[in-house]
Amino acid sequence: MASTLPTTWPHESVKFEDVSLRFTEEEWALLDRQQKCLYREIMMENLNNMISVEHHFSKANVMPQLEEVEDCWPMQREIPQDTLPECSGHSLDPEMNSFPAESPLMKIKVVEVLTLNKDMAGPRNALIQSLYPESGEDLNPGNLKPAQQPSKHLTDTEASRQKFRHFQYEESAGPQKSVSQLRKLCHQWLQPSTRSKKQILELLVLEQFLNALPEKLRVWVESQHPEDCKAVVALLENMTSVSKDDAWLACSSEATDELKEKRKDVATLPVTVPPEAPVTFQDVAVDFSQEEWQLLGPMQRTKYHDVMLETLGNLVSVGWEPTLGNRELTPDSPIPVVKPIHDPNPKDLSRNRTQSTLFESISPDEVQGRHTIESNPVGLLQEKGHPQQKLSESSKSQNQTCIDKSQCSLNEVLPRNHVKVKQKGTGKGKGRTNTISMTGGLRIRNQQKDSVEWRDRSGSTPVTHGSSIKNQQLGSEQGKTQTSRDPITLTVPAEFYQEATGSEEGRFRNSSNAMAADAPPKIHQKGPEWHKAGKSNNSMLQGSSAQNHQMGSRAGRARDNSILTHVKIHQKGYKEGKIQGNNNYLKHVKPHRKGSKEERLRELSTCQKHVPYVKQHLKTSGRGKGRKINASIKCGPYIKTYYRGSDVGRLRRANNCRKAISRHAQQISFIKIHKGSQVCQCSECGKMFRNARYFSVHKKIHTGERPYMCMSCGKAFVQSSSLTQHLRIHSGERPFECSECGRTFSDRSAASQHLRTHTGAKPYQCQHCGKAFRQSSHLTRHVRIHTGERPYVCTKCGKAFTQSSNLIGHQKTHRKKFKKQPKL
């Protein structure tokens, strides 16, 4: 505290009692430790002022005043006795201990005792430290520096501010005590007794300004301990060359080595001029080894594919000539295609949205031992005009891949359509190019010689296997081409194609059997298992539905009429011994010609030649609606007939046949409860349904019909939704995520059941006792306790159980008994 000495002095001597402040015992007990320390500092400042004006007073007059704050000096008893030899001993004589004016050093020693020693004084007693001599000079009143204001205790001030800002009201303390505590904390923070209003205002502005700074910047500024707003402004102005990462490292004592290395690399990165040589795709491409590629998951591979396509689009957009001629794909290099995580639904994609480009995954293990693609296998060029002509020209130049430059941009990525497989010919020197769709088509039919069409799911691009590719829209006539979107082809050796698809040379030839909707080319791995009908065109695999089989072009629908021809044999019957249908089926019809009408019908049921899922085919083709159709359809061990005007379908057993004779799919036997009502009842089990649509699914339980089959494991399902859910097991897709904990599920119902564990909802309540459950299966199991139902019966001892798990455990006891029996 700097001040000028007065020129005139009062005649009366100033005593220490005149400038000291005393507390009673009750008042002193109410003060906390910080307030007592503040009192000590003020007393020390008054003492220093008295010494600076050459006031003479004895130690006995000073010590009683400062003994009250003895608890603030825990180290006073450890001060060496030689610090003040004149004051050794407990009994101090006032006359012996008076401080003469000619001995300023004695005054300093007294001050030293009061401030716990020079080394212990620290920044809290900067005022006392200023009284010590510099360079060993003796002190005199002229050499003493004016008193300075004690330094601000930033640590204590910050702690007080934090306590004041985070003060919480306690009901047990009461409002009056809480207000007094808050006022005390505010005084400790702002210190109105020692600070002016301007300084207090500066503290408030400083606090608000620090809170307004970004988090990392605020932490760094607080680590510098600025005293006022000017210091903060100076720090921020000097930060023009300091990044936020540097600021974070400056305030963090545990910075990671990785971040330090990154900072070093960024700092030492030389500023170079971009090269004048053209940028190639290899400069921006990222390659993975076989081991690295196997460690990537499906999502990471999809991300890698998207990033590479985006990089390619950037290069094409700036006029780069996209060629990969000098890059050879070897068995050691990963195939830059990724496995599709899900098949994109075209209905969910708008015109302006980017369509997902998901490729069939080819692991590096499948590439082992296969031939290397030629040195210049893949090229990119812009196709204009006639696609067929351009494609034929491109096939002469190493089968280049065609991309429409207008379609290739950062906002839209071309979808995968098919893989072109080049196979070297052996006859006249001409090779054959096999093209396979990678999107999952709807069907394959014989379009021309050595050509099989696999239509894209979106209907935009059909894919042809053979010597030519023709773009046909779904439902359009044959020959009508489409140029809105050009295909993407990838050249692959024929040996790799044959091993990947499991098909031999000519497997696609003369094949008009329809394929499943979601089946990739791997459907041919099953071999003859999927062609049980041999060369017959009467069998059709059920993919999404037989309706997709009828959505093709008119020419394909006209050609593939063998199924209808077979149905006509049974549908129209025999008219006076004349056979209605194709002459190729004379041998098939002759066994049914003899006998009466009932006998012919009975023999007709023994027909072993069948057409799976004919009723779905007829439903989509529009034929047979509203009339009776007795077709040999594989429906189970029963024969169902339905006559117009009858209320209940007649059910009778076929003794020698596993086939059934039934009406159209929409006219299967059921009982309507009320006329005009949608509520119906199954004629076999009596189960009620709110709508005939639900009954159409239920009836497959009795008939054993499972039209939706998994192409990976061969498991069949009644509903398409069940197949979709099952396919997620093979693909690993888990699209349903819990919003509470982030856990993912492959089934929507499983996600909803899991969510009930967070919400505590129990929607399934027992009508007998009122107990609620989270899952319907738990309720079904509980109801058996009330009803006494025991559906699970042991076949060996006849004991019944309410749960299947109990039955399984019981059956193990029989096995143990059988093992314990001694051998004879």
UniProtKB/Swiss-Prot annotation:
This is Neurotrophin receptor-interacting factor 2. Interacts with NGFR/p75(NTR). The keyword Ribosomal protein does not apply. One of its GO terms (cellular component) is cytoplasm. Ubiquitously expressed. Residues 418-431 have a biased composition (Basic residues). Residues 137-159, 327-352, 383-402, 418-560 are annotated as: Disordered. Residues 14-85, 279-359 form the KRAB domain. Residues 340-351, 447-458 have a biased composition (Basic and acidic residues). The keyword DNA-binding applies. It comes from Mus musculus (Mouse). There is a cross-link at residue 15 (Glycyl lysine isopeptide (Lys-Gly) (interchain with G-Cter in ubiquitin)).
